[in-house]
């Protein structure tokens, strides 16, 4: 090897990102600044620990490990076997499940694996309607789940936006689905897992609970667990669970566990992402600590506080409040669309997402509401007092938008709120070991 080749070799292993790819470095640094200086209220987002970041950014990204611990199709897997075993055992302990698969790359893929394990194309299943708070993978017509299967959607009552269990039972008995899916991405009330299981048993269906949004609350003991009731439970590992982006599948049924394992590999995926599985294991260990119970309780308290503050300022909250980490704000009475609200709040450095409300007449790209969540801001350290202030800041921006002749006319209000946001976020720094360049 020549000296030049040796230098290149050394640089490959030792040059940092800023040296190798300044464009990507600048984008990451810009995102770091955004996260530091904005209040994150997207319900599906959270902020992970340094330990999770280190695990996910580790040399485990180099290792291929098709198969399962001690049953791999590649050599050199003795250490990644340790990692996956730890992730599995911690997940089982955290949720009180007999079996766990930690290999799903994402929430969509974990649910696809359940379909692959339990259904044939054309089979019937039931899931919560998207406008009632369901998820794309629960039967939306634009998703694979809605294209490959016969979907019967259920929803909420118009008068109170709560799940209509009588109608759900009627639909189940009429259509006799092979699978019933519960859980959603924008439903703020408790689920009656026991009642759903009774309905499933009566018609001979499987019950799948997708607890992606509330898994952290279940782990923290502030939300009823579906694990004793469901045939299969799926969850993403980020959101309220505060881990890396990925999926997790749980069951207490050994036969179903074997089907799930085969559906994930070789049915749906090849090699698992061992660096992500390591980060999942770290997050599960964090969630097993007493501090996580306090965190989960604070997430719910803060969401309730935000909902009550907005209600006191004249905003309509779907279903009248929340029992978990999220709330839907119905903006119809304010004559402001979800799209305009999201953009205006974004200019004020409050991040949320436009969201359809039950029986929404607006297009999905416009919507009549916004979805707000408390997990990320709670992770930063914001407490009830700060969430009251955040509620008032949201009210200022949206009331100003309602009164303004155009979005530009609301600029002074948005900039004044942005200054308040900056003052607040400066008190709650992220990753102080990292320099903001």
From Swiss-Prot:
SUPFAM superfamilies found in the cross-reference section: PLP-dependent transferases
Pathway involvement of the protein, from the record: One-carbon metabolism; tetrahydrofolate interconversion; Amino-acid biosynthesis; glycine biosynthesis; glycine from L-serine: step 1/1
Binding site for (6S)-5,6,7,8-tetrahydrofolate: 130, 134-136
Catalyzed reactions per annotation: (6R)-5,10-methylene-5,6,7,8-tetrahydrofolate + glycine + H2O = (6S)-5,6,7,8-tetrahydrofolate + L-serine
Compartments it resides in: Cytoplasm
Function: Catalyzes the reversible interconversion of serine and glycine with tetrahydrofolate (THF) serving as the one-carbon carrier. This reaction serves as the major source of one-carbon groups required for the biosynthesis of purines, thymidylate, methionine, and other important biomolecules. Also exhibits THF-independent aldolase activity toward beta-hydroxyamino acids, producing glycine and aldehydes, via a retro-aldol mechanism.
Cofactors required: pyridoxal 5'-phosphate
Superkingdom as given in the UniProt entry: Bacteria
GO CC entries: cytosol
Residue(s) at site: Plays an important role in substrate specificity: 238
Family that this chain belongs to: Belongs to the SHMT family.
PROSITE patterns linked: SHMT
Molecular function GO terms recorded: glycine hydroxymethyltransferase activity; pyridoxal phosphate binding
CDD domains documented for this protein: SHMT
Subunit structure: Homodimer.
EC number per UniProt: 2.1.2.1
GO biological process: glycine biosynthetic process from serine; tetrahydrofolate interconversion
Protein name: Serine hydroxymethyltransferase
InterPro entries in the record: PyrdxlP-dep_Trfase, PyrdxlP-dep_Trfase_major, PyrdxlP-dep_Trfase_small, Ser_HO-MeTrfase, Ser_HO-MeTrfase-like, Ser_HO-MeTrfase_PLP_BS, SHMT-like_dom
HAMAP family linked to this entry: SHMT
